[in-house]
Design a protein with these regions (language model features):
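A conserved hydrophobic position in a structured secondary element of the catalytic/binding core
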Residues: 16, 46-47, 78, 121
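A general structural signal for well-ordered alpha-helical segments in protein cores
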Residues: 31-32, 51, 63-66, 83-86, ...
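Short, polar loop motifs at secondary-structure junctions
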Residues: 59-60, 121-124
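Generic structural signal for small/hydrophobic residues in well-ordered secondary structure
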Residues: 17-18, 54, 86, 111, ...
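Short, well-structured N-terminal submotif of metal-dependent ribonuclease cores
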Residues: 1-46, 55-68, 139
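Alpha-helix capping/helix-boundary segments
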Residues: 20-21, 50, 82, 107, ...
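Active-site regions of enzymes building and remodeling cell-envelope glycoconjugates
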Residues: 73-74, 131-135
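Active-site neighborhoods of divalent-metal-dependent phosphate/nucleic-acid chemistry enzymes
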Residues: 2-10, 74-121
Length: 139
């Protein structure tokens, strides 16, 4: 699958970005398949920032489903190393890629620091990963 930071790697943790988890919650079968595949291999993870985004944006009637999903994933912390790397990227890309949020920089740095494959649909938010492709595209 070419949607990985390190294309072709199969044994790395899969770091699910918020958009892919939302697609799973909306019933997108491709997102669900990716999540189930990673979960069955013990490789499904999200950043604590993705956890924050989902919890902050959920409706009351979604609470139990979202918490169940988040609790089933390994939550990768945003350490000082992650913050430093994210800051370096923000400084490098802030003029050429104005729409990238601080959270996206931190998610990207989380993937790099933890050696994880980033699975996202928003590849334009992650210019630091040159070979990154949309996670839900058909192979």
């Amino acid at each position: 699958m070419a949607s990985r930071i390190t294309a072709g790697a199969t044994d790395l943790v899969k770091l699910f970005d918020t958009d892919v988890l939302i697609e799973h919650l909306k019933g997108n079968p491709r997102a669900t398949d990716l999540l189930l595949e990673a979960s069955s291999a013990g490789q499904a993870a999200c950043s604590v920032l993705t956890r924050f985004e989902l919890l902050a944006g959920m409706r009351s009637n979604e609470r139990s489903e979202i918490r169940l999903l988040l609790d089933s994933l390994t939550n990768l912390d945003a350490s000082s190393e992650v913050a430093t790397r994210a800051g370096e990227w923000a400084r490098s890309y802030r003029r050429s890629h104005e729409g990238i949020s601080s959270i996206d920089y931190l998610v990207a740095a989380t993937a790099e620091v933890h050696g994880a494959d980033l699975l996202t649909q928003n590849v334009r938010h992650f210019p630091m990963f040159f070979e990154l492709e949309p996670a839900l595209s058909e192979d």
